[in-house]
Amino acid sequence: MIHRLKTLLVSLLAIAIVIAIPLLSIQPSISVEFNPPDRGTPEQVDGGGTRFRDFAQPGDRMIPIFVNDQELECPLSAILPPENYGLTRQAYPTIFYHTPPVEGMEVIFSLRDAQERLVYQTRYLTGDEHGTYGLPIPAFVNIPPLELYQGYVWTVELPKFDASVSGTIVRVNTTESFDEEFAAASAEERLQLLADAGLWYDMLDQLAQLHRDRPDDPQWYDLWTEIAEAAELMKVGTKPLL
């Protein structure tokens, strides 16, 4: 199963990179056939993906960081395919990004809705761990769930370096048959189902959970490395998925 998943991830992302299809006709999926956007009622996600309206492309996906005129090994990175957006089935998803290894650096994470209204913001100082972080949007009473088929833009800022990266996230429905199959699946099978359905954010979250649950199993680290390389995030792929 893992070998098949790796093959699907690499081949589909490679196709997306080479063919340069316009943004509104690309779905950042793993092993599904891309459908043209439907400006009517959006379809639900199943193993064959979904149609959805076009969404504005956000800002930069990667920004190099320099300290004492030396470029750091890993750039500030939004962990997304080259198209810079992805899908989730979660009302409160987890969003992944990579910050460079500078301890004590302020990080500002912001999430805005389609009207550019601030939905959630948090600030923190980096520690001594170096890797790709998954930041969950908390299900607090004052934070509304993501609305279906609305484009939300998230931004990670490093004020110290005057640098920021952004990505788009769109929440979609899944079909009843998908939900039933997902509920009965093992952790590894769920990873495959999420990849097949093109749910980028949820696939990464599932992979990170597998890596945390089985830190001594190298296949999850290897798969993360291949995903990062296929998404043209080669430098961050050598660092752990936290």
Model-derived features: positions:
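Bacterial N-terminal signal peptides that target proteins for export
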Residues: 2-14
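Solvent-exposed serine/threonine-rich low-complexity stretches and specific carbohydrate-binding patches
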Residues: 118-131
